[in-house]
Amino acid sequence: MWWILLFLEWFVDWARGTFWYLFGRRSGLCKGTISPQGPLVVDQEKKDKVLQKEYASNEVPDNLDVIVIGSGIGGLTAAAVLARLGKKVLVLEQDKQAGGLCKTFTEKGFEFDCGFYYVGQLHENSFLKIALDLITDGQVHFAEQGSHVETVVIGKGPECKEYTIYNGKKQMEAHLKKQFPNDAKAVEEFFKIMKICSEKVRLLCMLKMVPLWFARFILRTGIADFISPILKYSRTSTSEVVKSLTSNQDLLTVFSKTFCGVPPKNSSCMIDALLLHHSKRGVYYPQGGASEIPYHIIQVLEKHGGKVLVNAPVSRVLVNEQQNAYGVAVKTGDEDIEIKASVVVSNAGVFTTFQKLLTPEIQADPQVQEYLKALKPGKGFFQVFAGFNATMEELGISSTDMRLYKGNNVDEMMEEYFASDKQDAPDNVPMMYLSFPSAKDPTSSTRFPGQSRMVIHTLVNPKWFEQWENVNEAERGEEYENYKMRFANHLFDWACVRFPQLKEKVALLHAVTPINMHGLGASYCSMSAEHNLERYQPLNIATIRCNTPVKNLYLSGQDIFTAGYSGALHGGFLCASTVMDRCLHIDLLLQQKKLKSKSVKKLE
């Protein structure tokens, strides 16, 4: 019996020591002050000098500590945080512009964001705002959008139904109850789940920071469930939870409106709850477009001795015989140039990192296979970028986003759609997301007078486009162009049902298929790993972490946490925490507490 007591005493002491080691030490990350916000930079040439700095061997800094592969938000966040903590960091981007899905591009005089729609939780002293200000020095000008965040439209005919989503701590719930008077209790219960998930989501960070054996121990013994019910919602589908509250399919569709490529029956309730909660305190859009975010992160990085270089495709991670990463090889013409650093961070995604940048021998490692088995490639995304020679007032559009569904049985619609024949698919798209970025950006009317822009987003099966996967865009031919425009025209016509004025004012219709993502190095033509229920099983949450079986090689970005801008940012902070071997989220939480205390004193 005595040995059990000794073991328990040792275990308690070990747990205390580990907790202090990971979560008790301060890093100094939040030391110093955020600069006063400067004027918005509208000079594109000035911005391009930061966002499009070409790779050249003489541009590579000496004595690098960290190399980051990929300049998406996850990679830039990790880079900026590590630079602030004294590391010399180089970010390598294979595209011609840094920023990942926060890039902007111009097509026939119309400016578009690649994949940014809005960001929530940026109210004063919020955790996300503090984190974002830290990596941008508070220089991004965000425009708060109206209280009407989104409209969900179910059905395509004259009998379609509309449900509106308004922000507000109490208003969002109250407004939904008005629209679903017979399901007020179900709405109330789902909002309780939202609160639990939003307050306890940091426990997921802890699962990824503590030793893996310990995370598995508290999960398998039920200790983690005793601490918080959030894991119950992470491993349970949205369909199962909502159907236990109501039989109303419309309400299920509204609660799962932002599903990330998977239907409600395969989607984690925790994720859908967090996504709805994300817009509860308002949504924001960067003035000047999404590229403002990487533009200012890069300047913070450069201020601390770092650099971001584009047109620098990494062909492999350099690994020695002891399976320690010590740098990367950059493909320049017919040769590979080796760049060395003590730490390598990959923001290229789990599949690209393990299956393209490492040797087959390392890929076969059981621990690597464990990562790959825990995740599946995400669905393919199809985008339509439309430009109009008319103002938002003339078109009758606003900053409110729209989510349109053919019907309310999303599970069934998705299953039928993805199983459909390639030739039938363009005419049977069951859902789409509609956004007007020009209506969200107050500077748009002065930067691009007389113009408006619309972005349509939907899901497709990458197999429908696989015959053109390895063909240069200029050589894909008429068949490819006609096929993708069948999707684009169908989606645009659907949008015109809602906004008839669009038809006669359209000046540009530009379609982007999943193979554009493949061309940017993404595996399986997807933006991130799939957000299915399997990914959010608690044991898989603990398994998918930033440190890898290859020593000194770390993962960052969406695949580590969740998809989307804030998910990638959290993935970046987790990665920096793992590299520094301390939980930097604690620094942010203490800074949040300090700022809130100051705000209270000002009011007294």
Curated annotation (Swiss-Prot):
Any single Pfam family the record assigns to this protein:
Amino_oxidase
Q: Which domain of life is it from?
A: Eukaryota
Q: Which GO terms describe its molecular function?
A: oxidoreductase activity
Region forming the signal peptide: 1-17
| UniProt cross-references to SUPFAM superfamilies, sorted A to Z | FAD/NAD(P)-binding domain (SSF51905)
UniProt keywords (A-Z) are: FAD, Flavoprotein, NAD, NADP, Signal
Identify its protein family: Belongs to the carotenoid/retinoid oxidoreductase family. CrtISO subfamily.
Listed name of the protein:
Inactive all-trans-retinol 13,14-reductase
Q: Which gene encodes it?
A: retsatl
